[in-house]
Amino acid sequence: MEFEPALIEVTLLRRYKRFLADVRTPDGREFTAHCPNTGSMMGCMEPGSRVWLSHSPDPKRKYAHTWQLVEAEGALVGINTGLSNRLVEEAIGSGLIAELAGWPGLRREVRYGDQGSRIDLLLEDGERRCYVEVKNVTAAVSEGVAIFPDAVSARGSKHLEELMLMVREGHQAALVFCVQRGDVHTVRPADAIDPLYGQRLREAAQAGVRVLACGARVWPGGVVLERVLDVDLSRAG
């Protein structure tokens, strides 16, 4: 996907209250932008970082600008979690993810299970179904290695339990890590941050949930998933 109109490059002053970021333009003007990422944004919110914002002309919006990209340790990183479903859908459509190819039908945000949850993407072929949960990944902890989650995620563990239930009911299920950065080759569960999530992820993989990861090419003009990444479920240490 490409950003249209072009993004605006500014300097990050601070990110706060999860949804807000103060920035400064090259000519010294300061204002507040919307931050579309509720995670900890570990390693992606250092004051002084170069960031890129999109602009909306909608007069009803409280904040006209939305934070899209940040330069972190020399890599451009897409921090907008709202783009991840679209990116994975595009990757499925292009055939990048072989494990999810060949499904003629696709629906978004479909209710499923007995708790009223919504699945990010539902692939269908007649009575056959594949439930696809998407997780946006931004945190990298060492050269080429990204982790998820970057904060304790009870919701993430719940989603894994629901995917396992779908497999037990005879359906297919997959979790796709959408890594919006180009300097990663492997994704690992963040056991040091959320050990329960790591446990549930391994249980899900053993139960038949496909655990997949794709890496993006990120540039100021857009983001596209273009590589399949390794997923390492071995226990650290």
Curated annotation (Swiss-Prot):
CDD domains: SfsA-like_bacterial. It holds the Pfam family SfsA. GO terms for molecular function: DNA binding. PANTHER family: SUGAR FERMENTATION STIMULATION PROTEIN A. Belongs to the SfsA family. This is Sugar fermentation stimulation protein homolog. It comes from Thioalkalivibrio sulfidiphilus (strain HL-EbGR7). The gene is sfsA.
